[in-house]
Amino acid sequence: MKCYNPSAFVPMAVTLVTVVIYLGVFIPLLIIHETVPSAPDDPTLYNGLNLTEAWLDLQSLSDGYHPFNSRKNDDVRNWLLKRIDEILDHNQIQYTTENETADTSDVQLESDFDKDVPESMSGPNNFNDDSVEYHEDLRTRKVSPAVTVFNDLRSNYSSNALTSIGVKGRRLGISTYFEGNNIICYVRGNDDEEGEWWKTGSVNSKGKMHGRGGVMVNAHFDSVSTGFGATDDGVGVVTALQLIRYFTTPENRPQKGFVALFNNGEEDGLYGAKAFLSHPMAKFVHTFLNLEGAGAGGRATLFRSTDTEVTRAYAHAKHPFGTVVSSDGFSSGFVRSETDYVVFRAEGYRGLDVAFWQPRSQYHTDQDDAKHTSIDSLWHMLSASVATTRSLTRDTSNTFVGPRSDDKIGKVSNGKGSDGVWFDIFGTVFAVFRLRTLFAWSLTLLIASPLILFAVSYLLNRQEKFYFFAGSIKSKNPEDEPISLGGWRGAFRFPITLFITSAITFACASLINKINPMIIYSSPYAVWSMSATLFFSVFWFIMAGCNFVRPSALQRGYAFMWMFVFGWILLVVATVYEDRFKISGGYLFVFYEAAIFLATLIAICEQFALPRKSTYIEDSQNDHSDNQDHHHQAVMGTDGANGADEPNADDEAAEEDQEETVNATAFPHETTPLIGGGQPSHRASVSTSFANRYRQVVPESYDGPADHDDKKGHKKHPYGGEQEWSAKLPIWTWLVQYLLVGPFILVILGQVGLFLVAALHQTGTDGSPLFLPYLIVAIFSILLLLPVTPFIHRLTHHMPTFFFLVFIGTLIYNLVAFPFSPNNRYKAYFQQTVDLDTGVNRVTLVGIEQYIRNIITNIPSAAGQSINCEANPRIRSGLSFCSYEGIPPQVVDNVVEGVPPEKGYSDWLSFNVSRVPNENKATFHISGVETRACILRFDDPFSEFKVHGGAKSEERWDDVPDSGSDQIKLWHRDWNKEWVVDVEWAVGEDMKPGDEGRSGRVVCLWSDANKRGVIPALDEAQRFSPQWTSVVKLMDGLVEGSKRRVGELVRVGGWKKGRRDDFSLALGLAFLLAYV
């Protein structure tokens, strides 16, 4: 019975270790990636939190679409104010409310709001619990109440944003005026100033600091017009509510002040967060935690962080999750979407961005509801938020106080932060350290590792034990032929195989991208399996084939050397990016190269066990002489006992056997056959094709090559025809090398690979490059399988055979399968535009043309129409805009039964424009019905604008960029309110002020789709589109209604004037005709 040494470098042991390592790493990784830690069975396990209450709040909050431009948004806002009151009353906290309006500030000393909140959104619990102990210290502080709630109806925002990055040429801006209606809840900390300090001094006072600064948690309570907003951002909102409950519980009283910001208007342009910056409380905030949702459930990940110190607060979470690679994606411009985090970071706050991130197919759709998330996901974000904010509010050091590192005037004085590196391990351990530390490690590794390898190689060479790159050596006897050591055998196998295999892997990814590019949308694991099994199978076939033809004991060592060289080059690039661009994701290559360096060092150091080359040559010559003598004796030996002078048949057979023995044990030289000669092979069967090569007799108890003779004096032979001196190599060092380059490296690489693919595999419907996720899968498949490549030639044939069959199956599936399903729905972007002058309406569906045309064929109102599709990179690059005439909208309730809706279009929007004499300036009066969002769109850029009654422009932003703007977005906090806007444009060459005007359109937006029949074209698209499709909003408004009139006699840049001007014009024309 054979007994294998588990540490011997033989196929059975290598195969077993490979299976154990890869399964032991990837089974936990996949479980963590696909599941969420369970919520505690006791919903009140943590004092001050109530998970059941939070879940009921989420269900109430996500009971309908509530975009900023909808009546439901007001219901949600009033519900939030009521819930804050109920929480504070439940904790019996003395608090005040400040109803801040544009003109006055009314302060109430108790919560006595009587808001119109729908019954369905009433609070889930009765908070008048007599069992709650009354805490006098919190209710009656010296001067000030413990909590202040700001009902902010005063803060406004005015600025600009440049148009799409994908547009070539000079980019124009989109100017914006926004009236905010945020809710701010301030919980006073023990170290905070007493009194209403926020009322002292100017809002824009420079460098003013109150106490030791505050900690803010931000969440937006508006949703998109086609999503219920459960995770975007309902979970964040109810988490902030629970944090108010937590910090107003006496045992959890914060040392530093805590601010909960419920901002409104994030989905349309981060407007709520920008409006907050003009509020007095903005100067109090030093650190923040932004809660977001870019998926629908799963784990909440740490998207990004401003610095190392604030990230250490997140490390206190029980189940941390995230990697700095995601932060690098944003900072490098690779990810172009943004959250409120970018607003607060630009203001100088130090903080974190925590968000849900998958599945993206449910993001902004009607599946972003409580049914498609879970209480476990809610708990994951809530528990991480509590741990983070508790750490920040208890930090009384100077970490977040003091002069800034950038010395920028006007920013909060919140200390000096350092760029950081962070990542989790199995969702349990969180590593955080400074980027400068990583840079020091990188630089040290770049310099020290090659020097150490060269130094050890030099010592080996001095001792005549460096067998790498060793050729033929002449013996002391000049008559003897040079003896080959075989040191170059296998030197270039690894790079050639890696190049060929990688090229085939990328070619396969390109093939899928060409034939069925969206398959990764619903089947990312099929693509992973295809890519990984292809690389593994091809790599094994080439390396095992080379080893079959010319076995080499140095193949493993050469593989590590090449891996070290390639890794060193990548580390150079990573180090440059760390230093120049502050990119921290290079930690992957630092750990990778460190592990490969140690494995390479072992591969070199194990040659200390080999004999000196000169000694080996002498021993080989002696063995050769002994073998010749033995052979001579076997042939010429006496047969006196038999008295026979002639050899018989048995003697001839014995002679042949002896000759074979001599030939088998003779040292190989130039005349040795390439295949079939050499020493007895002890290699197990690698494959059916190679079976004969390894069917050689070995002792039953053989457990691999040894580095010396066994106890019985039997000489140990090299493995499978490898160089004879390799019999002296240790048999266990491969296992140490495998453990170095295997488990830990696979964990950090596997987590990042799974994270990136999960984040990007469903972005193709957004217009992102379709090949990108396939490229990432191919790259990480290679990186994840590189640790096994130095040992791959010792694997049995069973693994590559099985993997090749898996590759064939997944390849066929990826080529022919339909890429979408009800669980992974394709996103079609919807918008309906109406010309309010002519009554013409067009429905536009945006996406990949192949699938959009498929969807439109199922829509009844589009039947028989010619569908026109064209690109519009200014709005969404990479997608097609396909339009048809749709069912007229009824967003304004002025439709008379039996009368076509378009007859009432003219009443939806009215405007008047007056020209300032002798100036390039005009004043617009705009009114929309059942909307609080309108837009002025110009055909040519303007240089300045001002909204009457608006707040003073912030110095931190320009209302209009240097390139000029061609749009002004106007957002009211009130309904059906008129805008009065002054617009001014530059004087052209050879022109005088007042000689030229501007043409364009006045547009108003409608976004409330809660009631069926209001936007029947949207209802129809959602009802009749295939089950693998979801219809989501394209722009700020689901419906855009616009007016335009060009008349040269009353021209102010082509704008339609009011009715009085139209009447005057008509009267003048009538007199002119009568005269003629």
UniProtKB/Swiss-Prot annotation:
Comp. bias regions, Acidic residues: 647-660
Cytoplasmic side: 1-11, 459-491, 547-556, 606-738, 793-799
Residues the record marks as carrying a glycan: N50, N99, N156, N912
Protein's membrane topology: Multi-pass membrane protein
Cofactor mode of binding and number, as noted: Binds 2 Zn(2+) ions per subunit.
GO biological process, alphabetically ordered: proteolysis
Cell compartments where the protein resides: Vacuole membrane
Family annotation (Pfam families): Peptidase_M28, PFF1_C, PFF1_TM
Residues where Zn(2+) 1 binds: H220, D232, E292
Amino-acid positions noted as binding Zn(2+) 2 in the UniProt annotation, renumbered to this chain: D232, E267, H364
GO cellular component terms given for this protein: vacuolar membrane
Gene3D superfamilies noted in UniProt: Zn peptidases
Site (Transition state stabilizer) residue list: Y363
Active site per the UniProt annotation: E266 (proton acceptor)
Function according to Swiss-Prot or TrEMBL: May be involved in vacuolar sorting and osmoregulation.
Family: Belongs to the peptidase M28 family.
PANTHER family: METALLOPEPTIDASE M28 FAMILY MEMBER, VACUOLAR MEMBRANE PROTEASE
Protein name as annotated: Vacuolar membrane protease
Lineage: Eukaryota, Fungi, Dikarya, Ascomycota, Pezizomycotina
